[in-house]
Amino acid sequence: MAILKHIASKSSNYGAALEYLIFKHDELRKTPILDQNGNRIMRDEFYLDGLNCEPYSFDAACQQLNREYQKNKNKNEIKSHHYIISFDPRDSTENCLTGKRAQELGLEYAKANFPGHQALVCTHMDGHNGSGNIHVHIVINSLRKLDVPQQPFMERPVDCKAGYKHHLTKDYLKHLQKSLMDICMRENLNQIDLLSPSLSKVSEQEYYAKRRGQINLDLTNLELLGDGFTCLLYTSP
């Protein structure tokens, strides 16, 4: 099943997004993984493109646009939006989804749903937290660079104008979810109804807290095994 995740960021460091996309990171601690010499390690495989900017100058391009319109100056303003499309792990084996094709779908999705924005589109093959699924990151500057034709999903007249900010509402989010579902159906990929409310939702903070707890238990169990114990500790599901 393909799912869509959204993260809004108030950080003015647009370069951090690019660094995350191209370098290996510890997903739990949100820190880069370093080699024995203290250097960051490039991800094994990724596909990267820029929309309305060169991908490796995304930081400078966003800062320049912000200065031009005198926007995103307040520390409490949302500077960027990060959308993540996670495809079902079965799609790579059952439906022949490749990283190259996922990148093409991500570019199609970003162009259709975030027109006029500077954006990074990057596909990772390694999965999140060992899940093994192909996923696409779309990071956009919250400030729109170009005037674009008015689209049905745009709720305000200024939502198609340069110099105005990305405005995510519940209806817009539903449109984004439906857009992803439509692509998956067209491509014969595994998909669930994203518009149906989930019976059980876990926040990102709760998820990572549980993951860290499991890692600590794993370390404790290794110590117990080293001391000759055979009765190990477990967490409840």
Language-model segments: what does each one mean?
Residues 1-236:
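N-terminal nicking endonuclease/strand-transfer module with a His-rich metal-binding environment
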